[in-house]
């Protein structure tokens, strides 16, 4: 290894180390919660001083990691050799079928932290930082892959675009403990070594690269379910590449073979793919088992069907429609400047902004057009003999040249039509790879925003190549100083705009600095005749690189600076109260979002959580919270949390109709067991044996204790839980009902009038107008719809228009219900205005009329007054815990209950 080779390798290592430091430095501030004031920051920090995790999946991973550290396996029980989690999906729990790479790695890091560094770190402390540390290591494969295609600067740009990609960064900062951390590391290594297997001329190197590729995907398979996406991607690429080899005359001349099949069997590309296939089957069999390998195709089709949010499952609604990451993403965020920003608001924003989109598409066009130009050119025959000594390149130069993908912007007619010098086989190889990669990931993105992370990779790598193109073009073809200045000005604008979104002064300063440096370099410094490339061109190239990465860097900075944990002391303390006071067989029921947190903080089983949500459970929980019949709500909890889905399954087996089965259950759940059984026989024509069998599940003799959690976040989520609860089984559709909650309060003293915006959207400002008299019980209120720009009342055909008109008013002042009446002159409204006042501070909440007497409204907003089925046993700020009193229900043996509105 000569001096130049050592310098080349050393330079790459230094660049990687610098990039690692930069990326981690951008992630680390998230741990300090800088967006929160010190006076409220304490609400989001646990008793150990560590911020709460940022989302609920982290708590599931943390609990499994702690399980493994505690008793050597994940979950709570070993049943027939399988690990079972008894904290989930009451009453039966779940067999754990989860990639445990995150568990094994975190436990290993925990051991290293305490043994090597001599610390006394908890699993939770290590887990808090694991995502940020591991995801930062994606710098290594990103730089290696991109440096294979472009120059140093292009590789730096591509690496930053990948590792700081908005959707990836938003899931990998400190306090986000999920499997996303592995995503780019293994996918990049898998594809890189896959392509290197095809590129290699030596059979030994083909095998080595194939082994490394399969090792990467094998480790990926232990870390994230979505690994099968990349197996499918590269499988499709392999087929398309073989077709491209034939179409573009890659390899041996087709005329030398008697048939297409004979030609194909003798191609180097086929040999590479066969090697990958054989090693891949054997390698994945080691990681996933033979059945796992054969099940990959089914898993691929299942993954795609899973993303179809409108798909109805067994007659019940698909709960995935309520998962944000499963929604069809927007192309761009809102606002004129949005196209130039990097964030999670749209697909283009997710890849780094409009500049990255155009840069990537330009390079893709070059690759494809070059491939077609090459079609009539015979593939170069590779020789193994050494050139004459005087014509040999240094090892370092050969390594650098071999790593670069030699193309020029001349292909775009910028600066001339120079003869194409690139390698035909590589051009077709990478053209095929990136076309397939972008098409498949674009299709995936159409199935949900979670796949935006997949489309980042090809566009980032193509942008890295673009930097190399631009560098060559500026150095060799662009001589007009005026055009150099135009490029500098454009780049200054593109770089300053995202920084201005953080701080206007900084944005303007960056723009002026780039322009000033550009002007001085172009017009103020005379070129040195001894210098092959003048300084001004390096300044222009640097400006291009800065313009491309600044949106992504600024987006990462904003994300890190605005992190707010996914929970607070209120919810955690409420769960701790359950843990300390309730029996071990207690089930916690609520909407699924906080299920993972309930499991770890309360150490109790839950009805469902973020990984066990089903359409059936979503319907029943939504029905329980939407109905005005608290007997039905209690009956649903009694059934689900003690016998699970057995009653539904039994009736579906009898009737063959899930909708009819649900209708029957809604009818019998509020009744006594004897009346329920009689109803099944007399009204629904079941025989006595069938009726007794069903009632055994709907009315279990010893129902498990149930705590219902009502929290403020569920107000904003009402649109979803009412959607599921109001599901129409006949036409397979639904409607949703909402609460509209303001972001602040308004002060209204006696004798005064105040107003507060409840909703400001689409040019419409919905305001609650509150009028207070000077006597007792003289507070009145109504809702107005105003033009956001002018403040005037909205009109339609010269008549006042208010789509959120309130027809009913509920007033609670200082904890007492003062009014529950109709609003005069607004009888045609579809909403109820709930007004809560305390010490002259008023909070108006607008709700659909269908929610006025709903179980959730009665418990959370009205405090459970006027009923005895649910008892408020504990409260924290924004969190109320209700014990279900089954003995006070008709089904529980009471003659009657105070349950209906």
Show which residues each predicted segment covers.
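Perimembrane helix-loop-helix junctions
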Residues: 199, 217, 230-281, 510-511, ...
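Extracytoplasmic
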Residues: 17, 21-51, 58, 71, ...
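Hydrophobic/aromatic-rich transmembrane helices and adjacent perimembrane loops
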Residues: 229, 448-479, 504-525
């Amino acid at each position: 290894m000569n001096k130049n080779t050592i310098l080349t390798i050393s330079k790459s290592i230094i660049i990687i180390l610098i990039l690692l430091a930069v990326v981690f430095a951008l992630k680390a501030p998230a741990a300090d919660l800088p967006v929160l004031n010190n006076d409220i920051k304490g609400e989001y920090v646990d008793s150990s001083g560590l911020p709460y995790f940022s989302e609920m999946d982290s708590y599931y991973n943390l609990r499994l990691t702690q399980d493994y550290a505690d008793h050597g396996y994940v979950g709570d029980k070993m049943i027939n050799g399988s690990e079972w989690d008894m904290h989930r999906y009451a009453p039966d729990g779940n067999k754990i079928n989860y990639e445990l790479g995150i568990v094994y790695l975190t436990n290993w890091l925990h051991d290293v932290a305490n043994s090597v560094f001599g610390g006394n770190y908890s699993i939770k402390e290590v887990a808090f930082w694991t995502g940020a540390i591991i995801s930062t290591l994606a710098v290594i494969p990103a730089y290696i892959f991109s440096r294979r295609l472009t120059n140093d600067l292009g590789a730096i740009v591509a690496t930053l675009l990948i590792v700081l990609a908005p959707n990836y960064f938003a899931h990998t900062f400190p306090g986000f403990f999920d499997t996303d951390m592995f995503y780019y590391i293994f996918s990049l290594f898998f594809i890189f070594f896959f392509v290197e297997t095809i590129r290699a001329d030596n059979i030994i190197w083909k095998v080595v690269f194939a082994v490394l590729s399969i090792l990467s995907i094998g480790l990926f398979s232990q870390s994230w379910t979505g690994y099968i996406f990349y197996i499918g991607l590269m499988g499709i690429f392999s087929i398309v590449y073989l077709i491209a080899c034939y179409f573009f005359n890659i390899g041996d001349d087709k005329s030398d073979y008697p048939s297409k099949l004979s030609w194909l069997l003798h191609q180097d590309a086929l040999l590479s793919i066969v090697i990958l296939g054989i090693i891949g089957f054997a390698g994945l069999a080691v990681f996933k088992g033979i059945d796992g390998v054969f099940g990959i195709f089914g898993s691929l089709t299942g993954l795609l069907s899973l993303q179809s949010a409108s798909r109805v499952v067994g007659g019940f609604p698909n709960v995935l429609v309520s998962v944000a990451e499963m929604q069809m993403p927007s192309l761009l965020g809102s606002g004129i400047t949005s196209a130039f920003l990097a964030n999670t608001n749209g697909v283009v924003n997710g890849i780094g902004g409009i500049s990255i989109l155009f840069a990537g598409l330009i390079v893709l066009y070059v690759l494809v057009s070059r491939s077609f130009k090459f079609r009539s050119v015979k593939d170069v025959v590779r020789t193994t003999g050494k050139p004459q000594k005087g014509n040999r390149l240094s090892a370092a130069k050969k390594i650098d040249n071999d790593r670069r993908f030699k193309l020029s912007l001349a292909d775009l007619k910028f600066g001339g039509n120079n003869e194409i010098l690139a390698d035909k086989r590589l051009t077709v190889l990478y053209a095929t790879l990136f076309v397939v990669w972008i098409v498949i990931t674009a299709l995936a993105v159409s199935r949900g925003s979670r796949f935006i992370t997949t489309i980042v990779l090809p566009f980032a790598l193509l942008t890295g190549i673009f930097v190399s193109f631009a560098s060559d073009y500026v150095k060799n073809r662009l001589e007009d100083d005026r055009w150099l200045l135009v490029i500098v000005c454009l780049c200054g604008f593109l770089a300053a705009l995202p920084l201005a979104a953080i701080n206007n002064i900084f944005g303007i300063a960056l723009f002026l600095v780039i322009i000033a440096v550009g002007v001085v370099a172009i017009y103020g410094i005379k070129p040195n005749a001894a210098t092959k490339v003048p300084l001004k061109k390096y300044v222009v190239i640097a400006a291009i690189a800065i313009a491309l990465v600044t949106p992504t860097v600024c987006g990462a900075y904003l994300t890190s600076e605005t992190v707010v944990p996914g929970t607070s002391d209120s919810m955690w303390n409420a769960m701790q109260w359950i843990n300390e006071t309730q029996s071990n067989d207690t089930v916690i029921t609520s909407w699924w979002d906080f299920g993972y947190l309930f499991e770890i903080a309360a150490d109790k089983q839950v009805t469902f959580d973020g990984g066990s949500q089903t359409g059936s459970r979503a319907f029943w929980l939504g029905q329980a919270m939407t109905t005005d019949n608290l007997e039905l709500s209690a009956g649903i909890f009694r059934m689900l949390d003690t016998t699970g889905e057995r009653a539904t399954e039994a009736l579906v087996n009898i009737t063959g109709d899930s909708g009819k089965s649900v209708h029957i259950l809604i009818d019998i759940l509020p009744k006594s067991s004897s009346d329920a059984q009689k109803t099944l026989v007399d009204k629904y024509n079941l025989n006595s044996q069938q009726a007794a069998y069903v009632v055994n599940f709907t009315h279990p003799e010893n129902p498990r204790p149930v705590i219902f959690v009502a929290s403020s976040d569920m107000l904003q989520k009402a649109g979803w839980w009412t959607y599921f609860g109001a599901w129409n089984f006949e036409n397979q559709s639904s409607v949703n009902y909402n609460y509209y909650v303001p972001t602040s309060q308004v002060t209204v003293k006696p004798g005064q009038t105040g107003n507060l915006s409840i909703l400001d959207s689409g040019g419409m400002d919905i305001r609650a107008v509150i009028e207070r008299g000077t006597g007792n019980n003289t507070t009145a209120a109504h809702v107005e719809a105003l033009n956001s720009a002018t403040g005037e009342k909205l009109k339609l055909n010269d008549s006042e228009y208010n789509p959120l008109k309130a027809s009913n008013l509920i007033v609670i002042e200082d904890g007492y219900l003062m009014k529950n009446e109709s609003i005069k002159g607004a009888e045609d409204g579809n909403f109820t205005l709930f007004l809560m006042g305390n010490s002259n501070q008023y909070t108006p909440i607008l709700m659909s009329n269908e929610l006025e007497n709903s179980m959730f409204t009665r418990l959370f907003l009205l405090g459970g007054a006027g009923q005895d089925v649910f008892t408020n046993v504990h409260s924290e700020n924004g969190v109320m815990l209700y014990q279900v009193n089954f003995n006070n229900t008709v089904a529980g043996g009471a003659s009657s209950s105070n349950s209906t509105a």
